[in-house]
Amino acid sequence: MGAAVDLLAREMSETFHDMRARLHDLTEDEFFWEPVPGSWTVFRDERGRWDHHYEEPDPEPAPFTTIAWRLTHIAMCKVMYHEHAFGPGELTWLTIETPGTPDGALDMLDAGHALLTEDLAELDDTDLERSVPTNWGEEWPAWRIFWTMTHHDAHHGGEIGALRDLYAATHRTGPDPDGG
């Protein structure tokens, strides 16, 4: 393993595990909690299948999103980036399965991360400059797939951590910390 691959692998792993630790004991109530009315989330469609709010192009301003939306977004992106950069490239946003539970989303997150970790382990430093396809048709250097997913974990993982803290602060049971 070359120095660049090793650095990407270490950073991707550390960022993922930091995010994953903040997801420990995620409840269904937290997963679906809408801190703002009209938040984008995960929901059952008219056929009873799980789906998620999504628009192209992204609306401006972007809607507020629930933990369910953010977590499934991270998980689905990992699978999609793998699928198009290193897999058969057949999966689309219309065909990928949307997980509808915390456990389902975490399972997809773990599986997607494992796929990307395996993809990176098969590369050497020169392979990182090779162009690979993305799910929206652009070509990127392979390193950018892993760099983007690391940034994605840090960005959305931080948002999820803040939402979990906000949920905990607004859903406390037991004695009032101010003594009231």
Name each model-derived stretch:
Residues 2-95, 133-180:
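Short, contiguous alpha-helical
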Residues 97-130, 143-154:
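Acidic/histidine-rich alpha-helical segments that form the ligand environment
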